[in-house]
Amino acid sequence: MSDNKQKKEVLKKAIGKIEKTFGKGSIMFLGEENAVQNIETISSGSVAIDIASGVGGYPRGRIVEIYGPESSGKTTIALHAIASAQKNGGIAAFVDAEHALDPVYAKNLGVDVENLLIAQPDYGEQALEIVDELVRSNAVDLVVIDSVAALVPRAEIEGSMGDVQVGLQARLMSQALRKLAGNINKSKAVVIFINQTRMKIGVMYGNPETTTGGVALKFYSTMRLEVRSIGKITEGKESIGNQVRIKFVKNKVAPPFKEAIVDVIYGKGIVRENELFNLAVDEGLISRRGSWFSYVDSTGTEHSLGQGKNNSLDYLLNHPELLDEIEEKIREKHGLLKKGEKSEEESLE
């Protein structure tokens, strides 16, 4: 017993030393409930993703990688983060290396396209220099790079089609991230790199998938989000969207491996009322009796939302104060109330 106590004391000192050297959150128990730290974040624009992140969104001063197969919803998730940053008075920039941003779709997701900074660089070095300048200005809250695969080094663009350019992009990313990481940390901006997956040739065992641009981004990222479409959303016989799973395969500021499942509707993205309804049902805030749904608000009044999900969503859309209350309750339950906000119980006191 005394041996055990002694071990705990030694471990406590070791953890204290590690945190002093490498910062708070560099080591923690995986099952810690209070692993949520007082970290400044930018909301992802999705309550489910904020919960899975463990800290209420993407941490400021850090690099985040969002990766997955084609058409899995990576850019949609990044655009929701931009809309969220702008909604809270922040300035966002989109480095469109793929030259594929759809302003109409971005606007549908809530992005203020009139005030969104956009760059369409000709080659990788130019894109990363633009990111560095924006970050060092200390005036930008969020920068999204879409995508790493499109950050083609200048030497490759200026060379001939048949030239063999081994490891150029990986070297470019490694060099750029060494410089960027410190500047990002000082500026308190969030930099999101969107990345694509590729299949490794000749892999017999393990996961044959890998991401482009070498391994530097994996190391420098505080969070790595794997985005995958896991099913279609249908209305009658018509497909209206995809069910998407977001897995935090790396998280330096909270326990990793948490998942969020969101509905991404074509042309609309992650619809707030739909997401809150699904979460409220899962959390037991909205009760279900057969096909009827009901909700008891903070005053104790029971609201019969309607029969079926669509009627219930219509009711909530006509009563936006209930949607706000549901979101607050969900965030409070997961310890994600923003700084300065109080829970309903604290407000009553």
From Swiss-Prot:
CDD domains hit by this protein: RecA
Subcellular localization: Cytoplasm
Predominant place of localization: cytoplasm
GO BP annotations listed: DNA recombination; DNA repair; SOS response
Signal sequence extent: none
PROSITE patterns in the cross-refs: RECA_1 (PS00321), RECA_2 (PS50162), RECA_3 (PS50163)
Gene3D superfamilies per the UniProt record, alphabetical: P-loop containing nucleotide triphosphate hydrolases
Gene Ontology annotations for the cellular component aspect, listed alphabetically: cytosol
Sorted UniProt keywords: ATP-binding, Cytoplasm, DNA damage, DNA recombination, DNA repair, DNA-binding, Nucleotide-binding, SOS response
GO molecular function, a single term: damaged DNA binding
Binding-site residues for ATP, renumbered to this chain: 68-75
InterPro entries, per database record: AAA+_ATPase, DNA_recomb/repair_RecA, DNA_recomb/repair_RecA_CS, P-loop_NTPase, RecA-like_C, RecA-like_N, RecA_ATP-bd, RecA_C_sf
Chain segments annotated as coiled-coil in the UniProt record: none
Function: Can catalyze the hydrolysis of ATP in the presence of single-stranded DNA, the ATP-dependent uptake of single-stranded DNA by duplex DNA, and the ATP-dependent hybridization of homologous single-stranded DNAs. It interacts with LexA causing its activation and leading to its autocatalytic cleavage.
PANTHER family hit by this protein: MITOCHONDRIAL DNA REPAIR PROTEIN RECA HOMOLOG-RELATED (PTHR45900:SF1), RECA (PTHR45900)
Record-stated family: Belongs to the RecA family.
Protein name: Protein RecA
Native source organism of the sequence: Thermosipho melanesiensis (strain DSM 12029 / CIP 104789 / BI429)
Gene designation per UniProt: recA
